[in-house]
Every structure is written in structure tokens, then in C-alpha cells.
């Protein structure tokens, strides 16, 4: 049976922005929480991608995230999600233990323009 969200997750109001993804239970480090899609959006002024699934659509940004985005390869393996991605299936994985009611976050920036 398809579930839009991992059973350990819920969507609710976020102090960061709008709605967010929260842990409904404690979640161990290195848990893959599900997939999200980055789809090509050619009609935008700046050729870019967007995420449109409950997991990808509601997870908020943090400079100190507790999750990372990893690319799902065609053979079912995973690899680092680096650079500008315009079409991919990605998974969200925890990089530290997450306690019940904690908001899950990822770093939106996958590249930097000057400076840091």
C-alpha cells in the first residue's frame, strides 16, 4: 500500500515557515524516510527544478539540517546529490537521531555563488 509519508512522520504548523514535517516517533540516525522528485521546469526564467510530494513539499530548510537529500540511481543504489539537479528521484535520510516532535529539515542550497 502506498503511503505519502513514512509512518513516523506527520505534517503540522512550523515555526520555521508554514507547514513542516515532524517526527511522530523517535527516528534513528541514517533512516531513509521516503522519496521525493525533482522535476525539470523548463518554462521558468531560470532553468530550475521543483519538488512536489508531501515529503519534499513540506520539509523546511535549515543551515544545520537533521536530514540530507540523496539521489536514487536507476539500479536502486544511492549516491550523493551534488550540483544543480534538474531531474532526479531523491530520498531523504536522517543524519542524526531525531526525537519525537522534532521538525525535519534539509539544506536547500546545493551550490554556492561566491563567498562561503
Predicted regions and their residues:
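Conserved catalytic SET/PR domain of SAM-dependent protein methyltransferases, capturing the structural core
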Residues: 1-116
Amino acid at each position: 500500500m502506498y503511503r505519502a509519508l513514512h509512518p513516523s512522520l506527520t505534517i503540522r504548523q512550523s515555526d520555521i515557515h508554514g507547514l513542516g514535517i515532524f517526527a511522530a516517533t523517535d527516528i534513528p540516525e541514517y533512516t531513509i524516510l521516503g522519496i521525493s522528485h525533482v522535476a525539470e521546469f523548463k518554462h521558468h526564467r531560470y532553468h530550475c527544478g521543483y519538488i512536489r510530494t508531501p515529503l519534499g513539499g513540506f520539509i523546511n530548510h535549515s543551515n544545520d539540517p537533521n536530514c540530507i537529500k540523496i539521489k536514487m540511481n536507476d539500479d536502486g543504489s544511492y549516491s550523493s546529490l551534488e550540483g544543480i539537479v534538474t531531474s532526479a528521484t531523491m530520498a531523504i535520510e536522517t543524519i542524526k537521531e531525531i526525537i519525537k516532535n522534532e521538525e525535519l529539515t534539509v539544506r536547500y542550497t546545493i551550490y554556492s555563488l561566491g563567498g562561503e
